[in-house]
Amino acid sequence: MPHHIMSINDSNHVQIGGRKSKLAVVQSEIVKKVIEDTFPNLSCSILALSTLGDKVQTQPLYTFGGKSLWTKELEILLLDSVDEFPKLDLIVHSLKDMPTNLPEEFELGCIFQREDPRDAIVMKQGSSYKSLKDLPAGAIVGTSSIRRSSQLIKNYPHLRFESVRGNIQTRLNKLDQPNNEYCCLILASAGLIRLGLGHRITSYLDDMYYAVGQGALGIEIRKGDDNIKSILKKIEDPIATICCLAERSLMRYLEGGCSVPLGVHSDYNESKQELTLKGIIVSPDGTVSIEDEVIKRITCDEDCEQVGIELGDKLKAKGAKEILDKIDMTRNINARPTEV
């Protein structure tokens, strides 16, 4: 049902910001449409901007160590306009790229529309292979994620896993080149589906733990902006919020960013009001893995936060922190200054 609100900043206009990639623009457009459909008296416009994570395409993500590769430039515009760029009212993120600890001036306004969170296998066009187990020994699988590669090395030791960067279409173009060494790619199914590329999905990795927040959109706002909050309250996804708050609490507790090998699986039973959160940490070489789960009845956001903390304690007790500390040491050794 449409809603009407008081004007925002003396106008009925909402300025949305997002990254410049095709997927990011599609996601911003999804939010724009839902806001305008829900609030007919509002109009929205979108500013698409390149970020550090977009500009540096030659290094594996885990070597950066930064937790705000995809957010920092946009956050500046949440505070004020800069040159020809307008002040933003909200930023649309892929939630999995959004830091769990935001600068004190900002907050997570809402969690919106979780698409299928699973990872997917995309085979080279014309390939007869359907699954990773069918691939010959030494076949090269492309993935941008240490979380994916560490789990897959553990389960498919006969394969080689190589980093591949770039937006989804760039990666697919690389894959389909006849002389390219990659047999397939591992990608988030949500991005493929949102871009209308669901037909490229060969199969789903049902047993693989996905990234924290994968498939969901996170909307970042200025802290205390009650007008924008009142809009977002009407469009949030309640079940995705429960699951993703718990997932993000776990990552925060383990002090991880989007470049650590933490995988999760969450499921909320509405009739029981019960959340099941599973988590896994795998060493980059796939030789050591630690997993556990927590099941808890949810009555408020604080319960979601507690689920993440409880699971974090269980994983730490089994040695998760040691794996993460070793990754930090490797990252610090490999880090190099990068021009952007």
From Swiss-Prot:
Show the InterPro entries listed in the entry.
HemC, Porphobilin_deaminase_cofac_BS, Porphobilin_deaminase_N, Porphobilinogen_deaminase_C, Porphobilinogen_deaminase_C_sf
Q: What is its EC number?
A: 2.5.1.61
User: Which PROSITE patterns does the entry mention?
Assistant: PORPHOBILINOGEN_DEAM
Entry keyword Transferase: yes
* Enzyme class at the top of the EC tree: transferase
A cellular component term, taken from the record's GO annotations: cytoplasm
Cofactor(s) needed by this chain: dipyrromethane
User: How the cofactor binds, per note?
Assistant: Binds 1 dipyrromethane group covalently.
The entry sums up its family as follows:
Belongs to the HMBS family.
Describe the function of this protein. Tetrapolymerization of the monopyrrole PBG into the hydroxymethylbilane pre-uroporphyrinogen in several discrete steps.
Q: Tell me what this protein is called.
A: Porphobilinogen deaminase
Q: Which organism is it from?
A: Candida albicans (strain SC5314 / ATCC MYA-2876) (Yeast)
- Coding gene? HEM3
